[in-house]
Amino acid sequence: MLFRSGYDPYQYVNSIITGTLNVLEYIRKVNALKVIFTQSIADVLHLFGSTDPISPDSVRKFPLIGDHSIYSISKNAAVDLIEHYFNQYAIKRFILRLPTIYVYHPNPYYYVDGVRKWMGYRYLIDRAINGKELEIWGDPFSKKEIVYVKDFVQIVDKCVQSSLDGGIYNVGRGIGVTLEEQIQGIIDVFCPVGVRSKIRYCPEKKDSPQFILDVTKTIEELGYIPNYDYKSYLNDFKKEMQAERFCKLWGRKEDFYL
């Protein structure tokens, strides 16, 4: 579908490409030392479907169709601009390739093709909180990177402190979590005491392609130490959900639920 509700490709180009160029020009003019940029994992989607760790320096591509195409094209162009400014003006660059970064926010929705939908993991958590059945689609042993925001922030801080020229770094743990482990963990952490959601296996339904990121470079060059495994992330997420420490900034969950 070429025309979608709420979808404007110019916004991606203007905010990501032109926006990055504006930042780089500002850095050049004030003689700042470095830029830290978040890159979409869509540039390595062509390597998904395997448990072989994906190198941070893999060939960058972009999906030819779908609502992430223009976004990914714009992100790749921004990375190319950053590399130009590094080589032309010696502006250090730390480009962080991000999978989904899991973080509590009272708004559990996002937009697909301009339409508001539940974020998948938030929908599952909500069902577990209410003791409802959870489904596992496709291969229950398919793995993916699960990264908690507090590990991501550690990497950003390492980039700020680093004296290196930088490069492209994967954000992850280098360890995949299976779909079954994801669902079991959500049940363990979020189901009410004395209640346990049942699991329905749906192998006929489509799952997401598995992937694991190679974080060796992130560890060795930046000194990154992953602190949150899957279960500790869920437990901390639950604490943040209950405390709502940033409610004056973000609002509360009742402000967003339909």
Regions found by a protein language model. Give the residues of each.
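NAD(P)H-binding glycine-rich loop region in Rossmannoid oxidoreductase-like domains
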Residues: 1-15, 46
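Conserved internal alpha-helix in NAD(P)-dependent oxidoreductase domains
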Residues: 10, 14-21, 33, 68, ...
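Hydrophobic positions on the long internal alpha-helix
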Residues: 19, 23-27, 81-82, 155, ...
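Conserved Rossmann-fold NAD(P)-dependent oxidoreductase catalytic core, especially the SDR/UDP-sugar
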Residues: 21-70
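Active-site beta-alpha turn of Rossmann-fold NAD(P)-dependent dehydrogenases/reductases
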Residues: 36-40, 97-99, 172
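Active-site helix of classical SDR
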Residues: 70, 74-77
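NAD(P)-dependent short-chain dehydrogenase/reductase
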Residues: 83-143, 149-154, 158, 185-187
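C-terminal substrate-binding subdomain of Rossmann-fold SDR/epimerase-dehydratase oxidoreductases
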Residues: 128-258
